[in-house]
Swiss-Prot record:
NCBIfam families: PRK08261.1 (NF006110). The lineage of its organism: Bacteria, Bacillati, Actinomycetota, Actinomycetes, Mycobacteriales. Belongs to the short-chain dehydrogenases/reductases (SDR) family. It catalyses: a (3R)-hydroxyacyl-[ACP] + NAD(+) = a 3-oxoacyl-[ACP] + NADH + H(+); 3-hydroxybutanoyl-CoA + NAD(+) = acetoacetyl-CoA + NADH + H(+); (3R)-hydroxyhexanoyl-CoA + NAD(+) = 3-oxohexanoyl-CoA + NADH + H(+); (3R)-3-hydroxydecanoyl-CoA + NAD(+) = 3-oxodecanoyl-CoA + NADH + H(+). The gene is fabG4. Its EC number is 1.1.1.212. Restores respiratory growth of S.cerevisiae oar1 deletion mutant. This is 3-oxoacyl-[acyl-carrier-protein] reductase [NADH]. Gene3D superfamilies: NAD(P)-binding Rossmann-like Domain. It comes from Mycobacterium tuberculosis (strain ATCC 25618 / H37Rv).
Amino acid sequence: MAPKRSSDLFSQVVNSGPGSFLARQLGVPQPETLRRYRAGEPPLTGSLLIGGAGRVVEPLRAALEKDYDLVGNNLGGRWADSFGGLVFDATGITEPAGLKGLHEFFTPVLRNLGRCGRVVVVGGTPEAAASTNERIAQRALEGFTRSLGKELRRGATTALVYLSPDAKPAATGLESTMRFLLSAKSAYVDGQVFSVGADDSTPPADWEKPLDGKVAIVTGAARGIGATIAEVFARDGAHVVAIDVESAAENLAETASKVGGTALWLDVTADDAVDKISEHLRDHHGGKADILVNNAGITRDKLLANMDDARWDAVLAVNLLAPLRLTEGLVGNGSIGEGGRVIGLSSIAGIAGNRGQTNYATTKAGMIGITQALAPGLAAKGITINAVAPGFIETQMTAAIPLATREVGRRLNSLLQGGQPVDVAEAIAYFASPASNAVTGNVIRVCGQAMIGA
């Protein structure tokens, strides 16, 4: 799916010829046009350097050598290459003094990181460290990657991946996460921390079609982010069951037709919602679905002192109670079983809060609660659950924000711009992949490393 053109007038102006010149003269930060996924294009625009002395250097090289231009590590050399990605394996750092390795690896090569480059640090889960000093050193990696993300320019991003120390030497569960981060699919994911468990993974037959043959339920699919999720899922090979309320029937039918899926008119807050979805699955898909995306959501903004019961209750019902009921119901009746994927839509408002949105922020923080509370029990059934928390995304809702507020909101992140619905959809598709079976309980922001929140 081709990326949509940005509706951000400021970015269009300062990236134009005359506008770019004027912006440089005035010292105005210039948002980079982010490189997003296009079928057939290489994952990175330059070579990939993998360094460090940890346990995943060689497994990563073996997993990625077919699709990436790998180069060797030469810490003392001068580089003529423009790197597309830099990966540092920090799993071998067991003492705080060993953090010097970060400086030694990155400092000589950072200036050679190309436009929209990727920086990924792989560490070990701090809570599972073998010693106090190792735990301290591994926890320190988060401050490094978040700070580096705020230093990089030209659309480059950082990420930290914590790998379970119980992962087998081949670390196959790490591959899907690394492929996502080292690609244009993660264009608006910056400064985030991913946790990968010990489970092994089997790569898909085709990394371009990782969802081939899967059945995906997407609520709130008539328009906006939900419709884009459906498009990305279909691109990746899934059959989409697109769900929305009957008042959105025309848009829902358009979405379903566009992606070759099926439309189901349904109020997710209805008492019989689980039964109707299960019936649809029995009639069309042998009673089973592989993926559930709890995307449906509404806003009813008001200062709490002025908020009536109707506004509070409606947001709670759609955004929090319905996702919990659907998840527990569809897992409980076997519609989603072993190998299943559940992904919830949280929001940066649920992390940082937002004035006038106590109801909305409560539900989006609650979505994080659903993810973290259900993850252990679902893992025992072979099901993963993760959440995506979008920041400022260019949608009809954000387009209605007053101009001055909208422009400020767009700039308050390391990438100096708003994201696109496809950025959210790509993160959800990564979580939905069968190869992401070692990834559960994560809450990942798609926010360009927003300055607010954690």
